[in-house]
Amino acid sequence: MAFLADNISLHMSGFNILRDVNVAINTGQITVIVGPNGAGKSSFIKVLSGDILPTQGQVILNDKALSDWSPDQRARMVSVLPQHSSLNFPFNASEVVALGRIPHQSGKVRDTHIVKEALATVDANYLESRFFTQMSGGEKQRVQLARVLAQIWEPTTTGNQFLVLDEPTSALDLSHQVLTLKIVSELALT
């Protein structure tokens, strides 16, 4: 298994958020987690990404406990688009997408090329120099998707890569919902 949640439980503020969750995710497959609002889907994603430690169980990434990978190594293998992303700094779209390149040391020229490619992939290249704070909700969502794509744009020597998306189409119009699902499907095949 490349990404494994082994007997995950999460107890917070007196509530059982997750209880005995077991999931195996292999590369090349799309795994969808569905459930009603408040069921713990976003909390599970935070456990998978290492943002929250489980009360019980462990997450295994590429045959190694998630906690045994350094933050930089994890960031080169797992890219997460959270349900809500806020950014109140005067960054333009290119600068936001470039944040996904921070864990890499591929050089400014290569990173600039990847940023442009990622923006084009999500149909947001026209937003390149627009400030993030001046974008619509759907435009922000596409720029953030470009950021997480840029983060795993190139293969890494440390192991398989995973894209974890929490409600990635929630703010998108229909055509960009279709585009997002197409991008995810194509990534799963590579």
Feature-to-residue mapping (PLM):
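The feature captures the beta-strand-to-loop junction immediately N-terminal to the Walker
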Residues: 34-36
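Conserved ABC transporter NBD signature motif
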Residues: 57-65
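Conserved ABC ATPase signature
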Residues: 131-135, 139
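Conserved structural motif at the start of ABC-family nucleotide-binding domains
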Residues: 3-5, 18-20
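Catalytic Walker B motif of ABC-type/P-loop ATPase nucleotide-binding domains
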Residues: 157-167, 172
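ABC ATPase NBD coupling module
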Residues: 65-79, 89
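Helix-to-loop junction immediately C-terminal to a conserved catalytic motif
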Residues: 49
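Conserved ABC ATPase "signature" region
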Residues: 112-128
